[in-house]
């Protein structure tokens, strides 16, 4: 495919063509009226703007079930993220292997940030450890954190945190499922 129209792209994205054109214009991509968007150029622009033109080195902290599963997840590599380090504070786990990497001690974090250029830290620890891990990541120079622990982290300005709360996501799905099963007589009672 050499080019794609805004109508085709909007159908794939689930948005209207005008919204898609407006959003793409913010990237500096305007397309050609009647021709569409050059697929190769558009993909390159989006990749560059999203910061995916390079591999981002990632460390996963917490080698329990979730941390090991995240370390083994192959989808990161296809999206420009390379897990270069796995760490845990539990000395019984240090030195073991997880997803082909040797589990390192938290004391090694500052050196790993310097040597590996770690850009992103993933917290997969119990909630009571998460804030301490976040503090250590920030002190070592990491400015992007993905937090799987069910707690709100306190970090200084200039540090980006994204929280993944699987329990909340399940609650949202339960709510939506409940809405589909609520009898229609309930709305009649309100009327």
Give a label for each model feature.
Residues 3, 7, 12-58:
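HTH-adjacent hinge/linker in prokaryotic transcriptional regulators
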Residues 57, 83, 119-121:
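Short active-site oxyanion
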Residues 66:
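Hydrophobic/small residue at the entry helix of a nucleotide-binding pocket
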Residues 74-78, 137-140:
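Short, solvent-exposed amphipathic alpha-helical segments in soluble enzyme
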């Amino acid at each position: 495919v050499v080019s794609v129209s805004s109508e085709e792209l909007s159908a794939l994205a689930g948005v209207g063509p005008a919204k898609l054109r407006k959003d793409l214009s913010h990237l500096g991509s305007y397309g050609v009226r009647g021709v569409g968007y050059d697929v190769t150029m558009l993909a390159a622009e989006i990749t560059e703007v999203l910061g995916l033109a390079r591999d981002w080195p990632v460390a996963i902290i917490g080698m329990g079930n979730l941390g090991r599963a995240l370390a083994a997840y192959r989808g990161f590599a296809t999206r420009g993220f390379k897990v270069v380090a796995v760490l845990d504070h539990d000395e019984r786990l240090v030195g073991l292997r997880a997803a082909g990497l040797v589990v390192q001690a938290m004391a090694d974090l500052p050196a790993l940030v310097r040597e590996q250029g770690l850009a992103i830290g993933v917290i997969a620890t119990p909630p009571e450890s998460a804030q301490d891990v976040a503090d250590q990541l920030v002190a070592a120079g990491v400015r992007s954190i993905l937090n799987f622990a069910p707690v709100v982290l306190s970090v200084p300005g200039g540090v980006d945190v994204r929280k993944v709360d699987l329990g909340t996501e399940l609650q949202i799905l339960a709510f939506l499922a409940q809405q589909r099963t609520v009898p229609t007589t309930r709305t009649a009672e309100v009327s």
